């Protein structure tokens, strides 16, 4: 597997673009991904029960088949909690995109992100979709078109050889606030020219989402709009992937790398964030316990504010472990911050405070927890909690 310079349109047969339709003041706010042939597809969605209209429309597209040829996305407006009219507007986005690209209606996925409760300005949406062209575009413009409070574009591309063919996989994501997936306010789109059955792609996506996107948190809020969509159009012409083979393992590793990079990028770009926090939990009896404990630690407001202030207060970490719901032995926990052991057998060690203080000034803080009761592990990612987070969200609509 090789990291390559690319974008969401790098896999063979894909195109992407973004335009300014006027939903936002300056930046691009409507974008699309298009495959020149129908692609096997998979998707996962927010677990928030107040799901936005685009979620229902995309689910409807998947009802008749697991194929997509286009994804239409707008930012600046979530089209959530907008009643029957919001549903009609999302359906209209799908229909207009299908007509413009001359593809079947159910080959189009719809995604929206932005302010909840406002009606879509359909005159602007319609004008934006009319700018669509089948096989032209600038992928960087698409990356910008899906952003809201993000401070940078998030994308990655890898290549590997499968069945004697070069296979490319690219991913792009947005997300900065309201991030606490199962899923959260994040959109992620992954394209690949690999040939893989849709059922296997869906199974793999769920496994990898649980390891990556569902292990990030910024503020504990789960959004109404999140989705991850994967399109595999087979244009690399590799032999159809089969589970349990060496080629499938290579594909799965590449999938993991793409999704982990995007997940960490979202956590790093949390609203107002100055530091990425990574929590690694080892020695658990179950993977689920390790992941649960890691995520509780990285979700703790007290841990997040300590990271912001450069305070190595391990009491906040052990407290989060205690209420995590995961299994552990209270008298046998080891905690390291940046490789510096500060807790052993659940008692404070003698450590170099100056070295710890210096480490906590870095932009990537790693907390290692060993439970010493098993062999399973899990990782979660988040960010610190700064004054800027409050400022951004206190004035979001203004």
Curated annotation (Swiss-Prot):
Highest taxon above the source species: Bacteria
Active-site residues (renumbered): 185
The keyword Transmembrane helix is assigned to this record: no
Gene Ontology biological-process entries: L-arginine biosynthetic process; ornithine biosynthetic process
InterPro entries: Arg_biosynth_ArgJ, ArgJ-like_dom_sf, ArgJ_beta_C
SUPFAM superfamilies: DmpA/ArgJ-like
UniProt-listed PANTHER family: ARGININE BIOSYNTHESIS BIFUNCTIONAL PROTEIN ARGJ, ARGININE BIOSYNTHESIS BIFUNCTIONAL PROTEIN ARGJ, MITOCHONDRIAL
Name of the featured protein: Arginine biosynthesis bifunctional protein ArgJ
Organism: Listeria monocytogenes serotype 4b (strain F2365)
